[in-house]
Amino acid sequence: MDHQPRSRIHREKNARDRLIRLVNTHPDWALGFQDERWWSRFALPRLHTWSDTGDSLHLVEQSKRKDDPEPKALACYGILLRWMNADAQLHEEVWLRFVDGRPVSAITIQFLEWCCTKLEAKGKRVLAMVWDNASWHISKAVRRWLRQHNRQVKAAGHGVRILACYLPVKSPWLNPIEPKWLHAKRRTVEPNGTLSAHELADRICATFGCAHEDHLSISKEDS
């Protein structure tokens, strides 16, 4: 962060804060903090506990067997959503979609389409979305899709527009989904072996209280 002009950091943070305040005045808007995360089946977060003898206990990291056909890690798109209920109470939930592969622009677009469909069903008209400057967020394909999507929503008179707000580079503390990722990694640790990819995804979704949806993927022709 040291190499970034301080004025730019403040400007982008202020844009995020203005967007948050704006959402609070529109009951048919939703505020979304979007991010992606890799979930390893083998690497363990830093955890420790204590035995009855007072000795520190540590988890033992597992190794991938040669006959294990599943991936070492799963990529996941997530969005922390907040909106005001009819009784003026703040509502919050997390939506997740796992990926067969890695985050790319085409998958990002699929995820945003899915979010808009779900939000429209909940009566929302605008998704005010905060996210970082990952290449699959700022690519020409994603920016073009955002413009086209918003034009189509305006022309049709229904749907969910997206207002995208980009965070300063390397500023995870400005995205409140980040600590939720860390908390979930600690809660989904398997101390007695290795979870399959499906078991890991199930456990992560259960931690966030959301359904384990079909994984997002793209064809080889689109990759």
Whereabouts are the PLM-identified features?
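RNase H-like polynucleotidyl transferase catalytic core
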Residues: S56-K66, H149-P179, N192-G193
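Short, basic/hydrophobic alpha-helical segments
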Residues: I107-A128
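Short, basic alpha-helical/linker "hinge" immediately adjacent to a nucleic-acid-recognition surface
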Residues: M1-S7
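C-terminal anion-handling pockets and recognition modules
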Residues: P27-W29, R161, K170, L174-S223
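Acidic/histidine-rich, metal-coordinating catalytic segments
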Residues: K124-I138, L167, N175
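Extended, low-complexity cationic-aromatic segments
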Residues: R11-W114
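Short, solvent-exposed loop/turn segments at secondary-structure junctions
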Residues: D2, E36-S40, R46, L81-N85, ...
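Mobile genetic element proteins and their domesticated derivatives, centered on retroelements
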Residues: D35, G78, L112, D132, ...
